[in-house]
Amino acid sequence: MFDQLDIVEERYEQLNEMLSDPEIVNDSDKLRKYSKEQADLQKTVDVYRDYKSKKEEIAEIDEMLNETEDKEEIEMLKEESASLKSAIPELEEQLKFLLIPKDPNDEKDVIVEIRAAAGGDEAAIFAGDLLRMYSKYAESQNFKTEIVEAAESDHGGYKEISFSVSGSGAYSKLKFENGAHRVQRVPETESGGRIHTSTATVAVLPEVEDVEIEIRNEDLKIDTYRSSGAGGQHVNTTDSAVRITHLPTGVIATSSEKSQIQNREKALKVLKARLYDMKLQEEQQKYAAQRKSAVGTGDRSERVRTYNYPQSRVTDHRIGLTLQKLDQIMEGKLDEIIDALTLSEQTEKLKELNNGEL
């Protein structure tokens, strides 16, 4: 572990020198790239230097203890040494987790897609509830949300809806929402008071830079059409909605706001995210075939969470976490669940680094 930490510290110092080089300072792309790399290493280096400093102080105190016979000084030095030594295990634990390879997509903005699945109108209403939950959570994290495309249901909620979430670390926070979400409750339209089970699927797609995925113009078919709302009524009076089809894969993205130019930009952004996601899914399936992770495979059909309204209970099936806080969670208070899933993923990665042992 310490060999790796020495390499990290050496790279950090190298980046310090590079960032004072006029050639790099005047190149915005390089400056952004190396500044981000340095920022990513900052915490690891800070903790490692704190660790080394405390170890050096302990060694110095040991030397002083060997040289003095003064009882008061010995007592004082022993107390100081004990205090320093008590901090070492926690710092070592921090360093283990800081060395875990980061997901390269963690800092990216995302496109979230929610689709009503089994359960008819109730599933569509639940999709709307999930949209509200994620919007509230995004607001609490100072993330910006924007609707990209929505197909409303006649009885409330959405057949499907996609929206962007922008902010540092958006993907790292929302990536665990991938999968099938199940709700158990009595629908408002149910006169007999029977509990119904409905599901909605959630897909979280990291947004991509042009350099990460190449799309040729000749591979795109772009159509404009008149947008329709719930029940088929026309929302716009002009053909401003845009549908883009990627011909080699058949992947389609649409956007139906008022501006055709904005719709084209939004649809293209979603298309890129979906194509990149296809690539990620292929890689994850290969990985999952070798080893299923503690937080699930990321498969969109995998049941990840159940929201039980009669018992005010939310259960995340991947880590066996149950919370009696349904009202709070539906108001966007997802931190406890997301933190637990993040810790589970980190622990699993740490086990892999240590050949199955913690």
From Swiss-Prot:
PROSITE patterns: RF_PROK_I. Methylated by PrmC. Methylation increases the termination efficiency of RF1. The modification N5-methylglutamine is found at residue 233. Its main location: cytoplasm. It comes from the Bacteria. It is found in: Cytoplasm. The keyword Ion transport does not apply. Signal peptide: none annotated. Keywords: Cytoplasm, Methylation, Protein biosynthesis. GO terms for cellular component: cytoplasm. It holds the Pfam family PCRF. The keyword Manganese does not apply. GO terms for molecular function: translation release factor activity, codon specific. HAMAP family: Rel_fac_1. Belongs to the prokaryotic/mitochondrial release factor family. This is Peptide chain release factor 1. The gene is prfA.
